[in-house]
């Protein structure tokens, strides 16, 4: 397949380069990624500034470009200008840290994959759990991403699908399997700590602790139980459960 590879951690991040090195052995890969760290960019795009595109050399045989914009910009620029006609799949990652539960809404990694689907290109986001002061398991995540890709044929891929793949932090032997599941609730209970600086301004810092109230059968639940999770996503945000009720409430 012809793969467009992007991320939100930046073009020099270990995750995307580990994945690129493995995928390029079996597929044609073009890397288009932010020049700098752009985590938690969500689906933001660059409007008021020009976007700078630079070709980057990589040690493996792929084309690579850095983009001065956001993860979503990377996909837009790639599919509009750099490789507009021959991409079979967009893969975003490997992200440093999970993208499960409500965190999906903030994720530049997932949003880049969603942007691919909005261009009618099947897409997958790949994220690996990160534990502070421990070495990331990108090679395990890359193997699972390649395995998912190899199970798919071009004719199997719906052009508006986004697959969200997350890999827990543990040895490969400890992984219990793969669960296809729904999105869970929040991972963390977040809050702002407050300090006062020398000029009397409030200085707020985001902090939090792990949310222990999780729902069984969700990505958050299975990751905590050492399963790889795969969740199909879609960019249509319509709440169909109350669509008719809303019509009756406001238009009847």
UniProtKB/Swiss-Prot annotation:
Its cofactor is a divalent metal cation. Pfam families: SurE. A divalent metal cation binds at residues 8-9, 39, 95. GO terms for cellular component: cytoplasm. Its EC number is 3.1.3.5. It is found in: Cytoplasm. Keywords: Cytoplasm, Hydrolase, Metal-binding, Nucleotide-binding. It comes from the Bacteria. It catalyses: a ribonucleoside 5'-phosphate + H2O = a ribonucleoside + phosphate. SUPFAM superfamilies: SurE-like. Binds 1 divalent metal cation per subunit. Disulfide bonds: none annotated. One of its GO terms (molecular function) is nucleotide binding. Nucleotidase that shows phosphatase activity on nucleoside 5'-monophosphates. NCBIfam families: PRK00346.1-4, PRK13933.1, surE. Belongs to the SurE nucleotidase family. PANTHER family: 5'-NUCLEOTIDASE SURE, 5'_3'-NUCLEOTIDASE SURE. This is 5'-nucleotidase SurE. It comes from Clostridium botulinum (strain Kyoto / Type A2).
